[in-house]
A protein has these predicted regions:
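Ordered, small/hydrophobic-rich secondary-structure cores
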Residues: 45-112
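Substrate/cofactor-recognition hotspot
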Residues: 113, 122-125
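Sec/Tat signal peptide C-region and signal peptidase I cleavage site
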Residues: 16-20
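Positively charged n-region of N-terminal signal peptides that target proteins for export
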Residues: 1-4
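Acidic, glycine/proline-rich low-complexity segments that act as flexible tails and inter-domain linkers
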Residues: 21-74, 127-209, 231, 238, ...
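Helix N-cap / loop-to-helix initiation motif
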Residues: 73, 107-110, 208, 240-244
Length: 275
């Protein structure tokens, strides 16, 4: 318990230093209102509805405090929020934030790729749920479907392309993890990862590798995938993301996933950064 309290204190101390420009409640309120209007086009803190007190707490915290933490752009914040909600399968909230993402400049192709990126992490059925939700937003906005194709590989090139990406981002792959799997089928899983994850998905257009790595870390944070968070820290660094950007991304996830999952990811970032 003492360890958890200590970690919380460290996280909060870092957040407070990043939000030094917010000096009183009125500053927080004004920032909240501005961000909310930019994202959704409406008014925050209306005091209306069935639970106005909780909505005030939620909106001030997310849009007045979390949105002021770190060096992320509004586009990055909304892509992170959308991929977190897709991973959690909180589809009504995903629909709202998909609209917000478009409002702050995320293109339809980028948003679709954010959804497609979830497939290797959470499986095809849940990815399709998220895609269907985002497609509803596209249709409501008159965006014609299907969108422009973004595939970059063929049957002949997917392995070579995937291996090139994997070797650059994760030298050594997962060979040691799959050693000893019965029937030698660990080798099949290794090839699936290379061909499907890196070849079919990571090579696609619209999102660059740096963005894919950052968003992937947010998925793993949401899933509390401790082992993969260690390795994907280095994948992010190899792609050009700084430890500070990774930290800000995890904090952006925090209001949606809660403190325990976020603190675990922040602890891992701290451990890997210190090595």
């Amino acid at each position: 318990m003492k360890k958890v309290i200590c970690i919380i204190a460290i996280v909060l101390a870092g957040s407070l230093s990043a939000m030094a420009q917010i000096t009183d409640n009125m500053d927080r309120i004004e920032v909240c209102k501005q961000n909310y209007h930019t994202l959704f086009g409406g008014e925050a803190l209306t005091g209306q509805g069935t639970d106005p007190e909780m909505m005030d707490i939620l909106q001030k915290f997310i849009f007045g405090e979390v949105f002021q933490t770190g060096d992320l752009t509004l586009k990055q914040r909304e892509m992170i929020t959308c991929i977190t909600l897709a991973t959690m399968q909180t589809l009504p909230q995903l629909k709202v934030h998909a609209g917000a993402a478009l409002n702050v400049g995320v293109t339809p192709e980028e948003l679709r790729e954010v959804m497609y990126l979830t497939a290797p992490f959470i499986g095809f059925p849940r990815m399709l749920n998220a895609v269907a939700t985002v497609n509803e937003v596209f249709k409501e906005r008159g965006i014609s479907l299907p969108l422009e194709k973004q595939g970059a590989v063929t049957e002949k090139t997917r392995h070579e392309t995937g291996k090139a990406i994997q070797d650059k981002q994760y030298p050594g792959g997962i060979a040691t993890v799959m050693d000893g799997v019965p029937g030698g089928m660990g080798e099949d899983v290794e090839q699936f990862l290379t061909d499907y994850f890196f070849g079919d998905i990571y090579s696609r257009g619209a999102l660059d590798l740096q963005t894919r790595e950052l968003l992937g870390y947010c998925i793993l944070t949401t899933l509390e995938a401790e082992s993969q968070l260690h390795s994907h820290y280095h994948g992010n660094i190899n792609a050009g993301n700084s430890p500070e950007t990774l930290t800000a991304a995890v904090i952006q996830c925090l209001p949606y996933i809660g403190f325990p999952a976020a603190i675990m990811a922040l602890r891992i970032i701290k451990e890997e950064y210190a090595k």
